[in-house]
Curated annotation (Swiss-Prot):
Its EC number is 3.6.4.13. Keywords: ATP-binding, Cytoplasm, Helicase, Hydrolase, Meiosis, Nucleotide-binding, Repeat. Residues 513-723, 1351-1546 form the Helicase C-terminal domain. One of its GO terms (cellular component) is cytosol. The lineage of its organism: Eukaryota, Fungi, Dikarya, Ascomycota, Taphrinomycotina. This is RQC trigger complex helicase rqt2. ATP binds at residues 300-307, 1157-1164. Transmembrane segments: none annotated. Belongs to the helicase family. SKI2 subfamily.
Length: 1935
């Protein structure tokens, strides 16, 4: 016995200290540990023979009698003895409880033996027999006694931590799951032979079938002590064979039956169309897989039908998105919401992915679902991904997709099911990827609060419970384990180990292979032989053939007697594969990926027909093709792995997959599988195939890189989150179960059961390594982890941190291709590649003939070899050696990815070496050097390619493109090919670039690029899109000043593209810059545009800064007015420093003033001081306050109305598009608060409006908006008011309020300011402000915005954990998305409602009043939303809750910064871009908007300082750093819209000639700026002559445009006069292009649809908001409209199309799909009435009566929200009229009656369903009497008398669906009765009160009769503009 045990011990000792030592350590991960499996038989024999280990079948009654007297006292004594011995550290009481628990857990005595063996070791193995034999007696006695008292007898001094030994006894069993036992080398102190994890499970799980874990094959430590029962061992001279018999089929369980497909719903029935029933496993899994959403782990043998289980899970997910009344009824239609979900199937290999795509695609095609492969070989476009519901991918590819923060976030958001196939590859090197994916998915589920189901498919696992826990599977529901007994065709497994030295082992493998194949063929079976290279398939087949002949068994290979032999022979004869033809004669075939597809299919067909008996193939056949055989044989297990640069063992995945091909259930009841390996690997394969070793984690191998991925993604932002993240990995599961494997001592696990310290140690070390490599910023004090560009790039391109370390040292700003290739060669990705002596000769040849770049290292080194083979690959050199070919492919695959990473790193460092790196990257992709001719990238015939290279190489592409086809033909000496060459030249993607330079300041330049594609698009070569890089390079070629990406597609290739950006320029100014446009994929497709800076004039705008003086704060008593002091005293007692400084100038002088100061510094007080002075000194004058936005107007009206109006006894009025006060109210007002456009429109008629002439003070708030598109209006207002003042001799004081600007001098000069200029620094604030600018990478907007949410949450926790926070976003959608993510982050906090400060009762009451769903969801978490899409009440609730500190966070659009004064301690500007449909992309916000947002940071009455965080795109950080502190120069926008404003002045008579216009311009701000910065505006120089020429040209162009629009006409050579159209344009405040378009397209008989079209085409809708993807919404709405938007001939993304659609949607009363469209509809309806009125006037001018009536009808329809055919029914809400006639009859009958009478008449009417609405509409309907008379030949008199009272004093019509109240109005038309020509038109309205404030019910109208219509028969029509009301009177006009 000692000798045999020593054999075992000595054999184990040979494995080394890593697997066998005195210290606690495990060898579970060691490859050599697998040899334990081979010793299992030996150990069994030793234990049984010498240790009397009992087999339960051998225990007899007499044996039991011998032990009958053993009781608990005996057991107690035994435990005491064991505890006192030195072989265990266990306390007696603990050991006693563990033994009892083991006895209670199972009746399986073999299992009890193994448990006790682990507990007490081999030293006490004799006691085990006694305990096992007396187990029933011991348990019975134990159950009858008090276990606590028994335990107390064992050890007086022992007390468990839990307070009871019983509890600790159970705890011991649990702890033993992860506590290894020591193995001592001392014979005198022997412990158990086997160490490792104890997986002692007492629970019985409902779906574990055939688990032998507690039987005699699997031990409590998760490893087998012995091979399965019945295993045999055969020892031959040349090899050893272990035969594992196939498992017996699992017997049918009670009640078990196969599930019939016919009993399922339609989804399953049609998907499993060819099935009658599911198989056993599928039937058992079905209730959970299809009926629930549980996570699942299905462990079952290969070939058991797991793929169909995955399909069931897919169908369950799909069913959640299917609309059907009854899924059991096939006649019911199915509507699948395909865009709402994604399913991801993760396959271990690309070949399997392709197979899954084919299978799933066919099965689910009937549902219209698309299945696509997304792997390294199969890339998908964004559109393809959007169209795909089921993505089949590999772990690495899905890792790449999900780790990109700027990836397709919508893809990740829509994933609802992740299926992981072959999850047992966790133990493989690639297992770390699976762990990373599962952890990321589970954390995404938690943060997003959206369920993502995870389904794992696996072969049978020894520790499947660990994997189930890792996948988040409920053990009692989603865990399914099926032993090999459930395999459809049980497999007998043969493990053969070839003996001998390395020189002869291959020969012995051949011998063993032949022996087994011969036996199988003799038995009449087919066999598939798997080898590991294409070449070996042929060699093995030929070797076998020779052996058959040598042994005289060649007759067995004769297949000529097969019935289909002749047909097969004919097919084979057509093949060009010589080996295939030759081997076919001997019933042998070959199959590998190097064969033609037709030959592979032929081989598969012949084998399936049985004609081929032997098939030699590679593993690709096992993965890619379902071709089973009775027997499979793996010949050899060594294959070349280029990633490691050496031969490695065949992976268990491949072995199991190949073994899975054994067996054809339809033909045989069993199968056989062989694996032939070397003898030293035999035990390894026995272990892994028979599941003897538990699956361990390999996550630590990739921990550093995976941590970097999570930090870069933004899901891990500090060490605590990293520790939490590690808790989701399989590593964490296994560290707790088997700690010693991972270097964790038992005591450490006891003290820290959750391993928090160990996890913190692991992530801290990993974070330190990342920080050392400049990949992240690691703040060790607070644990923050902040990603850096280098880390993001490494994560996105799957670059490991060792390579990054190399790059940090070797990457330079200037590098040649040779330098870059040398750098690539040293990357760690290639460190495993070895240089072998047998390759040197070929490498030398390749270096000499195919390596144009000089080598830095010897080919005997790894880097030298990589260098050569990479260059050879680019040169398309042929490589002979097999391993060298594999290495070349591996290097090529990785080099492209690494060079892309290098390119981005170089760009992030602004290094010009980026160009060279990009060029090399394209060379690798194209396999062509940059010095070769670009045309070679096309598929040129070989002879033509040679001629192009030889003849065209010296000519540039520009020269070639200028040549004719004939010249090109002559050049290449082949005239026929001239057109071909010309065609290819035209397809090379090149760009033309025109550059405009716009100096902003003395060191900042704006470049505007007009880019025009200069090539012909060909889908074959260009695909769907082409990417270009636009670089701005300095004159030295060393630095990239700026870079942009430009994406072209076939749709926009024919249009020009504008790019605008700013760059810093150095001092002294460089002579030129280079604009370089480079194709992302095409070599030689480069355009270099030099830009000279010699003519650029940078004016030094000396910015006058007003220093803040050290003054004593001025008390409010300085006002010397008790009323004003009382107003101020409610808020403060002293003016602040800024107010103190400007107080005297504003309050005691009449000089014009400019106050430039940051938001929040008290500028409003300047307006109040000036107002008080104006009203005091000029009491009859008016003050006009002009704010740029309606929101600001409303804020000012609310503020001053509350504070000033009543105390001062003054009146104030609001003038905006939302309010229309009558003239009397405006005339009586002291203060007018209005918008620029409204005041501009009013002052255009200043001569007829006395209140305009009475203005003494005009306040221009936010005057820095001069530079915006609305700025010209401000210029015109100031210029016009100055003109009015000069005409009336009344001075108008101007006060301009602004943020600090960089060119305040120009503003002061324009405003005629001398002593009143106050331009304070940005830092001058009552509350100091800290500003942080954070850059975020990525070009895609939405993913970038999403990546900002986690940093925003962290910023709140850092800067303002309890104080108010204001988050500004760019759109309404972003408010919702941001709130959603913040809520998810709150959910992960200890207190999810940390931002809420009100009780539940108050919250419920408030939420009940909220309408918006997103706001309802956000408020309970202390987050409010604010945007224009909310109702007024919702906005008010959000504002009040935030101001009153009931909620801490307010997420708002940028308009809130202007509109509502809601300061906060912390302001986060989340993105500085917004979507602009005009450019079809995202545009930067005005800097003034950003400054306004920042101004909301800091609360003067609460905060000592404020904090602002600006989140911007990384490339824009420098821009904001510069201008946020220096101020942005204010430029003019007037030159872009000069024509419209000149038209207004011409219409009013202010201008009548070009010189007058020139003189008028001198009064504008534009005139001053064009002299200061002429190049910015397009002047040729900075001298006066150039500027005058520019201005003259500008004015002449404007006049010409107005003439084209018929707005002006030339009176004589110099003088111009306005036309009626020009006056209409001015009066209605329209663009002249609107009227031009109308006049050009309108026809006399135009119908309603054309009227609607021309309305939508108005230029006023040019700026209607278009958001991302709204074209898709437009398409859907358009389908429901009466008139299609196709009539506009514009793309669906166009603003005019949207206006057309919204206008109709309003009339059709459609429910709009998004809230944004509701607000947009209001915006459109704000404009339409004004435009329609102008169209009516123009139509009247043209004499088109029909058109006038059409537009009046359109106006009625818009107000009543209906089409013309529904106008009567729409005008009578509450009436269910069946026709228009019926509605009209009601109207004629009931309109104008009194309210009481109507209620009485209609109360019982069955057609009335809403009597209140109906009555309101009827009583508001005007009932009139009209009299027409002619007082003279040129006058027509009309008398209109209203017979009923209006609904209200303002004569508002009943139009509940129109957004604003509409007053009742009428059109009076005089129309020729015969020709229908319109002679005259007049508006009339009863609205407007009399002087005595009574309402007016009668009108007298006098109309001029044109001479042309006298003595004509005319009809006078009075048409209501809001109701379908027409009065007609015919009259013959007198002469």
């Amino acid at each position: 016995m000692e000798v045999e045990l020593n054999y075992v011990v000595n054999h184990l000792e040979k494995l080394g200290p890593a697997s066998f030592c005195d210290t606690p350590y495990s060898f579970s991960l060691s490859d050599s540990n697998a040899e334990l499996g081979a010793l299992s038989l030996k150990v069994d024999e030793i234990l049984k023979t010498n240790y009397n280990l009992i087999n339960p079948e051998d225990v007899t009654d007499s044996d039991n009698n011998e032990f009958a007297l053993k009781d608990l006292t005996w057991l107690q004594n035994c435990c005491n003895e064991i505890s006192q011995s030195s072989s265990t550290e266990l306390d007696a009481s603990v050991l006693f409880e563990a033994v009892i628990m083991s006895l209670k857990a199972t009746e399986d005595q073999c299992a009890i033996q193994e448990d006790l063996l682990n507990l007490v070791g081999l030293d006490h193995i004799d006691l085990i027999s006694d305990i096992v034999a007396n187990s029933s007696n011991l348990i019975e006695e134990y159950m009858n006694q008090n276990d606590t008292s028994i335990a107390a007898q064992l050890s007086d001094g022992y007390t468990s931590e839990a307070g009871s030994s019983a509890t600790h006894g159970q705890g011991l069993l649990d702890s033993l799951k992860s506590r290894p036992r020591r193995f001592s080398r001392s014979r005198d102190n022997r412990g158990p032979l086997f160490t490792g994890q104890q997986v002692f499970e007492v629970e019985k799980y409902p779906h574990v079938y055939g688990d032998k874990r507690l039987g005699n094959t699997i031990s409590v430590i998760g490893k087998k002590f012995a091979l399965p029962a019945g295993s045999e061992r055969e020892d031959y001279q040349k090899y050893e064979e272990i035969i594992v018999p196939h498992a017996q089929r699992a017997p049918q369980m009670q009640g078990e039956k196969l599930l019939e497909i016919s009993s399922m719903d339609i989804l399953c029935r049609k998907t499993f169309l060819s099935y009658q029933t599911l198989n056993r496993i599928q039937s058992l899994v079905y209730p959970i897989a299809y009926k629930t959403n549980e996570n699942m782990l299905i462990c079952a043998p290969t070939g058991a039908g797991k793929t169909d289980v995955a399909l069931l899970a897919m169908l369950q997910t799909i069913s959640n998105y299917v609309e059907s009344m009854n899924l059991m009824d096939e006649s019911e239609p199915l509507d699948v919401h395909r865009d709402d979900f994604k399913i991801v199937y993760i396959a271990p290999m690309k070949a399997l992915a392709a197979e899954v795509v084919e299978k799933m695609g066919k099965r689910l095609a009937w549902l219209g679902l698309k299945t696509r492969e997304l792997t390294g070989d199969m890339q998908l476009t964004k559109t393809e991904i959007a169209e795909t519901q089921i993505l089949v991918t590999t772990p690495e590819k899905w890792d790449v997709v999900t780790r990109k923060s700027v990836g397709d976030t919508q893809l990740a958001e829509k994933v609802r099911l992740v299926i992981i196939d072959e999850v047992h590859m966790l133990h493989d090197e690639r297992g770390a990827v699976i762990e990373s994916l599962v952890a990321r998915t589970q954390r995404l589920v938690e943060t997003s609060q959206q369920m993502i189901r995870i389904v794992g498919l696996s072969a049978t696992l020894p520790n499947y419970l660990d994997v189930a826990d890792f996948l988040g599977v409920n053990r009692y529901k989603g865990l399914f384990y099926f032993s090999s007994a459930f395999r459809p065709c049980p497999i007998e497994q043969h493990f053969i180990g070839a003996k001998g030295s390395p020189k002869i082992v291959n020969s012995n493998i051949d011998e063993a292979c032949f022996d087994k194949v011969l036996k199988l063929i003799q038995e009449g079976h087919q066999v598939m032989i798997f080898v590991h290279s294409r070449k070996e398939t042929i060699n093995s087949a030929k070797k076998l053939r020779e052996q058959f002949f040598h042994e005289g068994e060649a007759d067995l290979l004769d297949n000529s007697q097969h019935e289909k032999y002749s047909l097969a022979q004919r097919d084979v004869s057509k093949s060009k594969n010589k080996e295939l033809k030759e081997l076919f004669k001997y019933s042998m075939g070959i199959h590998n990926a190097g064969m033609l597809r037709s030959d592979r299919h032929l081989t598969e067909r012949l084998f399936s027909m049985g004609i081929l008996k032997i098939l030699c193939c590679t593993a690709t056949l096992a993965w890619g093709v379902n071709l089973p055989a009775y027997a499979v044989l793996i010949k050899g297990t060594q294959l070349y792995d280029p990633q490691k640069g050496s031969f490695v063992d065949l992976g268990v995945l491949d072995v199991l997959q190949i073994f899975g091909r054994a067996g054809r259930p339809q033909f045989e009841s069993s199968a056989v599988a062989y694996i032939i390996t070397t003898h030293d690997k035999l035990s390894h394969y026995i272990s892994v195939v028979t599941q003897q070793s538990p699956i361990e984690s390999r996550f630590t191998d990739r921990l550093v890189d995976n941590l970097n991925a999570e930090v870069s993604l933004g899901t891990v932002t500090n060490i605590d989150e990293a520790v939490s993240w590690l808790g989701y990995t399989y590593l964490y599961i296994r560290m707790r179960r088997n700690p010693l494997v991972y270097g964790i001592a038992y005591d450490e696990l006891v003290e820290d059961p959750l391993l928090g310290s160990k996890r913190r140690e692991l992530v801290s070390v990993a974070a330190g390594r990342l920080a050392d490599n400049q990949m992240i910023v690691y703040n060790k004090k607070n644990g923050y982890l902040i990603p850096k560009d280098l880390g993001r790039i490494a994560s996105n391109y799957y670059i490991n941190y060792q390579t990054v370390s190399t790059l940090n040292n070797l990457l330079k700003s200037k590098m040649s291709e040779a330098d870059i290739i040398a750098l690539l060669s040293q990357c760690s990705e290639f460190s495993q590649i070895k240089s072998r002596e047998n390759e040197h000769r070929e490498l030398e040849s390749l270096m000499e003939n195919s390596s144009p770049c000089q080598l830095r290292d010897s080919i005997s080194n790894t880097s030298g070899k990589v260098n050569v083979i990479l260059q050879s690959y680019i040169s398309r050199a042929h490589v002979e050696d097999f391993t060298l070919t594999s290495d070349t492919n591996y290097v090529a695959q990785n080099a492209g990815r690494i060079t892309r990473a290098l390119f981005e790193i170089a760009m992030s460092r602004t290094w010009a070496s980026a160009f060279t790196i990009l060029s090399l990257n394209k060379s690798i992709d194209r396999r062509q050097w940059s010095f070769e001719h670009p045309l070679l990238q096309f598929d040129l015939p070989h002879d033509l390619a040679v001629k192009v290279e030889n003849q065209c190489g010296s000519l540039s592409l520009e020269e070639l493109s200028d040549m004719s086809t004939g010249e090109l033909g002559d050049l290449i000496h082949n005239r026929k090919m001239g057109p071909t060459v010309k065609k290819f030249i035209s397809k090379l993607p090149l760009l033309n670039i025109n550059v405009d330079l716009l100096p902003l300041t003395k060191n900042v330049l704006r470049l505007v690029l007009n880019i025009t594609p200069n090539f012909n698009w060909d889908m074959r070569y260009h695909g769907n899109s082409q990417m270009f890089w636009i670089f701005v390079e300095d004159s030295n070629g060393l630095e990239i000043l700026h870079h942009e990406q430009l994406l072209l597609n076939k749709r926009n290739v024919s249009t020009s593209h504008l790019l605008s950006f700013t760059i810093p320029v150095s001092n002294p100014l460089p002579s030129q810059l280079y604009i370089i446009a480079v194709s992302d994929k095409w070599l030689g497709a480069e355009t270099v545009t030099p830009v000279s800076l010699s003519n650029v004039v940078f004016h030094d705008d000396s910015n006058p800064i007003t220093e803040l003086l050290d003054l004593q704060p001025l008390p409010i008593t300085a006002l010397h007015d008790p009323v004003l002091e009382g107003i101020c005293a409610k808020r403060f007692s002293f003016f602040n420093a800024v107010q103190t400084q400007f107080f005297h100038t504003i309050y005691h002088t009449d000089t014009n003033i400019f106050v430039g100061a940051p938001t929040g510094s008290g500028k409003t007080m300047a307006a109040e001081l000036a107002t008080w002075r104006a009203l005091h000194n000029y009491p009859k004058s008016k003050v006009v306050y002009i704010a740029p936005m309606k929101a600001l107007v409303k804020e000012r009206v609310k503020d001053w109305g509350h504070r000033l109006v009543e105390p001062m006894g003054i009146s104030m009025i609001e003038l905006t598009g939302d309010t229309n006060p009558d003239v009397k109210a405006v005339t009586n007002a002291n203060i007018i608060i209005t918008t620029p456009e409204k005041w501009d429109g009013i002052t255009r008629s200043w001569k007829s409006r006395k209140y305009v002439q009475d203005v003494s003070l005009i306040i221009l708030d936010e005057i820095h908006l001069l530079g915006s598109d609305r700025g010209p209006v401000l210029e015109m207002i100031v210029s016009r008011m100055n003109y009015v003042a000069s005409q009336t001799n009344k001075k108008v004081r101007v006060l301009g309020l602004s943020t600090a600007v960089a060119n305040a001098n120009d503003l002061a000069n324009w405003l005629n300011i001398r002593d009143g200029l106050f331009n304070f620094r940005h830092s001058v604030r009552p509350v100091p402000l800290e500003i942080y600018i954070d850059g975020f990478p990525g070009r895609a907007y939405c993913p970038r915005m999403m990546s900002m949410n986690k940093p925003a949450f962290q910023a709140i926790k850092t800067h303002s954990p309890t104080q108010p926070v204001l988050i500004f976003v760019s759109s309404r959608r972003q408010t919702r998305l941001t709130a959603k993510d913040l809520i998810a982050f709150c959910g992960l906090e200890d207190n999810p409602r940390r931002f809420l400060y009100m009780d539940e009762e108050e919250l419920e009451m408030i939420v009940s009043e909220v309408e918006d769903k997103s706001l309802k969801l956000a408020l309970p978490f202390g987050i409010a939303l604010h945007h224009a899409g909310l109702t007024e009440n919702d906005r008010k609730i959000s504002e009040e809750l935030f101001v009153n500190n009931k909620v801490q966070i307010l997420i708002a659009t940028s308009t809130l910064a202007w509109g509502v004064n809601t300061p906060a301690h912390l302001v986060i500007v989340k993105g500085t871009e917004y979507y602009d449909a005009k450019i079809g992309g995202y545009k930067d916000m005005d800097l003034t908007d950003v400054l306004q947002m920042l101004g909301r940071a800091g609360r003067p009455q609460f905060d000592n300082s404020g904090v602002a965080r600006i989140f911007v795109q990384d490339i824009k950080k420098s821009f904001y750093k510069h201008f946020l502190h220096s101020g942005f120069p204010v430029e003019s926008y007037l030159h872009k819209v000069l024509d419209n404003h000149l038209n207004a002045e011409i219409a009013t008579g202010t201008i009548d000639c070009i010189q007058g216009a020139m003189d008028f311009l001198t009064c504008t701000y534009f005139y001053r700026r064009v002299h200061q910065n002429p190049v910015y505006y397009g002047a040729d120089g900075d001298d006066q002559k150039s500027i005058d020429t520019y201005l003259s040209k500008l004015v002449v162009t404007a006049f010409n445009e107005l003439e084209k629009s018929a707005c002006i006409y030339r009176v004589n050579e110099e003088t111009y006069a306005p036309t009626t159209l020009g006056r209409i344009v001015s009066y209605y405040y329209l663009f002249h292009t609107t009227i031009r378009n109308f006049v050009q397209k309108i026809t006399e008989n135009a119908e309603f649809d054309l009227a609607l079209q021309l309305l939508a085409e108005a230029s006023e809708f040019d700026d209607l908001a278009i958001r991302h993807n709204e074209d898709l919404i437009n398409i859907e709405i358009n389908k429901s409209l009466k008139y299609s938007a196709a009539c506009l001939n514009l793309p669906m993304v166009d603003a005019h199309v949207k206006a057309f659609i919204l206008t109709q949607a309003h009339m059709a009363r459609l429910k709009l799909p998004v809230d944004d469209y509701v607000t947009d509809t209001s915006t459109v309806l704000d404009q339409v009435i004004r435009i329609i009125q102008s169209y009516i006037d123009v139509s009247a001018e043209l004499g088109y009566s029909h058109v006038c009536l059409q537009y009046i009808s359109l106006m009625q329809c818009l107000k009543q929200a209906c089409y013309p055919s529904e106008i009567y029914r729409a005008s009578l809400p509450g009436l269910n009229a069946s026709s228009e006639k019926e509605a009209r009859d009601y109207l004629n009958k009931f309109a104008g009656n009194k309210t009481d009478e109507l209620y009485q008449m209609l109360c019982n009417d069955p057609n009335v369903f809403d009597i209140e609405s109906l009555v309101n509409s009827l009583i508001s309907y005007p009932k009139m009497n009209i009299e027409v008379s002619q007082s003279s030949s040129d006058k027509l008199l009309l008398y209109l008398r209203r017979l009923n009272q209006p609904l209200n004093p303002d004569f508002y019509i009943f139009a509940p669906l129109f957004p604003k109240p509409q007053s009742e109005g009428f059109f009076v038309l005089i129309i020729d009765s015969e020709t229908q020509e319109l002679f005259a038109i007049r508006r009339a309205s009863f609205a407007g009160r009399r002087n005595d404030d009574s309402i007016r019910l009668s009108l007298r109208i006098s109309m001029d009769i044109p001479p042309t219509c006298r003595n004509r028969n005319v009809k006078v029509m009075v048409v209501c503009d809001g109701y379908p009301l027409i009065y007609e009177h015919k009259i013959v006009l007198m002469i």
